[in-house]
Amino acid sequence: MIDIKDIQEALPHRYPMLLVDRVLEVSDDHIVALKNVTINEPFFNGHFPHYPVMPGVLIMEALAQTAGVLELSKEENKGKLVFYAGMDKVKFKKQVIPGDQLIMTATFIKRRGTIAVVEAKAEVDGKLAASGTLTFAIGS
């Protein structure tokens, strides 16, 4: 298991933008991670004060960070950065609210040079919250 210290070693993100709390499962091309969503998240102050919902774009960012942990934990990529290059087929199916535990899965489906394509999904209580195909570039 990869803990928060390992995650912080791999990713440059820090509070309030670090959106991966723990890695539950990891292999060469697949990763499962979690984010504990609490009422203390800064985005809930404005989205929405009387009905707090995690913004969909931040769910996708959490998925991208999940994939980033996998890629940046590899010896050949240590010290590099991962940059978003695109999102396709993104769907939001369930609202993510305070108290939810977001389970994020990313599977690499294609790599060419410094470009990678990932199928990603986020679930809450076994129900699909969001999914999509993410493309990113690995830079130095």
UniProtKB/Swiss-Prot annotation:
Reaction catalyzed: a (3R)-hydroxyacyl-[ACP] = a (2E)-enoyl-[ACP] + H2O
Swiss-Prot/TrEMBL GO biological process terms: fatty acid biosynthetic process; lipid A biosynthetic process
PANTHER family from the UniProt entry: 3-HYDROXYACYL-[ACYL-CARRIER-PROTEIN] DEHYDRATASE
Localization of this protein: Cytoplasm
Annotated catalytic residues: 47
Pfam families referenced in this protein's UniProt entry, alphabetically: FabA
UniProt EC number: 4.2.1.59
Molecular function per GO: (3R)-hydroxyacyl-[acyl-carrier-protein] dehydratase activity
Free-text function comment from the UniProt entry: Involved in unsaturated fatty acids biosynthesis. Catalyzes the dehydration of short chain beta-hydroxyacyl-ACPs and long chain saturated and unsaturated beta-hydroxyacyl-ACPs.
Family: Belongs to the thioester dehydratase family. FabZ subfamily.
InterPro entries in the record: FabA_FabZ, FabZ, HotDog_dom_sf
Gene Ontology CC entries for this record: cytoplasm; membrane
Principal location: cytoplasm
Record-given protein name: 3-hydroxyacyl-[acyl-carrier-protein] dehydratase FabZ
Record keywords, A-Z: Cytoplasm, Lipid A biosynthesis, Lipid biosynthesis, Lipid metabolism, Lyase
Gene that encodes the chain: fabZ
